């Protein structure tokens, strides 16, 4: 694109071409015709030997035209040619600046039309001729091609070739635009194109950076719209033209594709595409968010997508880790929300752009799906879904052995795990670090038969690294139902009595009274204590294995039997250990 040039008011200098065709009007007999008897011509003879298919306008009286011609006599001898001077004729038609025959011969012509004109002497240079060039009473033959036509009353002509169905905004004065264009003269001669430069033409509209006609022609355009803009020379480069590519007094034709538009005063634009019901929390500065996105330019060109990487984009918002426009655009979003975020370049990558996919001064459009977000200060969110109808006197606490069913999913509904796949409830001892901290917390204080929903932030789940099947930094949603609970055992205990242990423990355990207790007697004694309700084993473990571990602990010398000296209660061992430490 060429810059706007200063207006020109210099007088038109007439070359020899115009001097030949100037106001030398013979005394004629008006609009006559060729003599039927083959005598002298009474009027101009016009042969239209090439007529273009499209003719949007025809030359009228008072129009300014630019044309090439060859002038010859009847014998074919050339007396003048604009081609020889490589200079078009540029002149007003019908105001006496041309010989009458040429004035009449140009009327009704279309751009790119070719005509042969036969001008009789009385409509040419008459009985006087033009000294040294045109003899008296000469009939003149002209071969003319019209290249341009305009009128001082013309305005910019705008034709919309393609308009997108959705138009988020239209160009106004003061906006900054990026567009592609092809520039031609009215006869189709190309003089410039942005496509050959490998980038759009970027400029402000209505600020004097463009020729006046282009300033006007871009107004009201939508991103993605295609226009044809015809600009008369007095709204383009006027009498001086531009360099060697745009001649003086040339009408210009631009085919324009608007890529994007913004204003330096623009803020981030938000459009909610889908809002899930029951949004109880919106993202704020300092939250950590996981989201999917498609990023495109204003014309729809995709430059990036998290979906192509099969991984969410994970970041803190409102803390400068992402471009300012995205930082702003993500705040206030709900989990599961889909929104469109339009970011002007001064809140994105500015005048320089980034990489080879985001050009300078580009407006960016992100279609975002918020998967989840959390704050490092978040705790487990607990919501009771249902409670048993009967009175609940005992609830779960640290150390309890619990059985529960659960479904675990991401906040977008993606199911990860369920206990129903295993055909039995999950088992855990609360506070024993056997489940993630958030689930451990959420299972406490429950009644048997109660159902809860737990929202567990990642720092109380699987953290930034995630786990098998669990993405990093994922917030987890659990639905849990408590099936049963049992009081647990103190840490380090495999068996406890409900009351005091027997006073003569070894004698009671030595069933055959031989002074030693083999594994069979030990197992029989412990099982009897459990069945009689005098004691209980660690819940959730295989009783045989637990009893075997207890026997191994008491068989100090590992000889396969327990003696009275070896048998000690854990409480006695703990007291001895404390005494030794003291």
Swiss-Prot record:
Compartments, as annotated in UniProt: Endoplasmic reticulum lumen
Residues with glycosylation annotation: 70, 182, 294, 310, 352, 393, 407
Bias (Basic and acidic residues) ranges: 556-582
Alphabetical list of CDD domains matching this protein: EFh
Matching Pfam families: EF-hand_5, FKBP_C
Activity regulation info: Inhibited by both FK506 and rapamycin, but not by cyclosporin A.
Name listed for the protein in its UniProt record: Peptidyl-prolyl cis-trans isomerase FKBP10
Gene behind this protein: FKBP10
């Amino acid at each position: 694109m060429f810059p706007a040039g200063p207006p020109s008011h210099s007088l038109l200098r007439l070359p020899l071409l115009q001097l030949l065709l100037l106001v030398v009007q013979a005394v004629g007999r008006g609009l006559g015709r060729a003599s039927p008897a083959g005598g002298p011509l009474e009027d101009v003879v016009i042969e239209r030997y090439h007529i273009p298919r499209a003719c949007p306008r025809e030359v009228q009286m008072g129009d300014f035209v630019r044309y090439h011609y060859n002038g010859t006599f009847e014998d074919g001898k050339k007396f003048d040619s604009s081609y020889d001077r490589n200079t078009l004729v540029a002149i007003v038609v019908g105001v006496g600046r041309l010989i009458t025959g040429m004035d009449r011969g140009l009327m009704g012509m279309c751009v790119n039309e070719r005509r042969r004109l036969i001008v009789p002497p009385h409509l040419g240079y008459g009985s006087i001729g033009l000294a040294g060039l045109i003899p008296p009473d000469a009939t003149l033959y002209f071969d003319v091609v019209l290249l341009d036509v305009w009128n001082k009353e013309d305005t910019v002509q705008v034709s919309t070739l393609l308009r997108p169905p959705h138009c988020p905004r239209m160009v106004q004065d003061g906006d900054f635009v990026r567009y592609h264009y092809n520039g031609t003269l009215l006869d189709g001669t190309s003089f410039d194109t942005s496509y050959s430069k490998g980038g759009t033409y970027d400029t402000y509209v209505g600020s004097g950076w463009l020729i006046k006609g282009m300033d006007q022609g871009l107004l009201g355009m939508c991103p993605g719209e295609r226009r044809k803009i015809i600009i008369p020379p007095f709204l383009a480069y006027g009498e001086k033209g531009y360099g060697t590519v745009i001649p003086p007094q040339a009408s210009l034709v631009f085919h324009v594709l608007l890529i994007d538009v913004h204003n330096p005063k623009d803020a981030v634009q938000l459009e909610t595409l889908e809002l899930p019901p029951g949004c109880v929390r919106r993202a704020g500065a300092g939250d950590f968010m996981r989201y999917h996105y498609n990023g495109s330019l204003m014309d729809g060109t995709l430059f990036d997508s998290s979906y192509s990487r099969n991984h969410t984009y994970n970041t803190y918002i409102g803390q400068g880790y992402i471009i300012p426009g995205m930082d702003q655009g993500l705040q206030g979003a709900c989990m599961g929300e889909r929104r469109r975020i339009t970011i002007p370049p001064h809140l994105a990558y500015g005048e320089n752009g980034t990489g080879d996919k985001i050009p300078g001064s580009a407006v960016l459009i992100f279609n975002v799906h918020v998967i989840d977000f959390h704050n490092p200060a978040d705790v487990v969110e607990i919501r009771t879904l249902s409670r048993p109808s009967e009175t609940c006197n005992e609830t779960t606490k640290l150390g309890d052995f619990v059985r529960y069913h659960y479904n675990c999913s991401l906040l977008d509904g993606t199911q990860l795990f369920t206990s129903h796949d295993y055909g039995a409830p999950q088992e855990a001892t609360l506070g024993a670090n056997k489940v993630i901290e958030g689930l451990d917390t959420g299972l406490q204080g429950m009644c048997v038969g109660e159902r809860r929903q737990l929202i567990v932030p990642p720092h109380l789940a699987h953290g930034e690294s995630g786990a098998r099947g669990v993405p990093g930094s994922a917030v987890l949603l659990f639905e849990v139902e408590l099936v049963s609970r049992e009081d647990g055992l103190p840490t380090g205990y495999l068996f406890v009595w409900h009351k005091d242990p027997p006073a003569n423990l070894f004698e009671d355990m030595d069933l055959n009274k031989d002074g030693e207790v083999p594994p069979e007697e030990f197992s029989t004694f412990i099982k009897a204590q459990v069945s009689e309700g005098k004691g209980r084993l660690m819940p959730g473990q295989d009783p045989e294995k637990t009893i075997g571990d207890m026997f191994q602990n008491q068989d100090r010398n590992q000889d396969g039997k327990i003696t009275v000296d070896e048998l000690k209660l854990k409480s006695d061992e703990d007291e001895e250990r404390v005494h030794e430490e003291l």
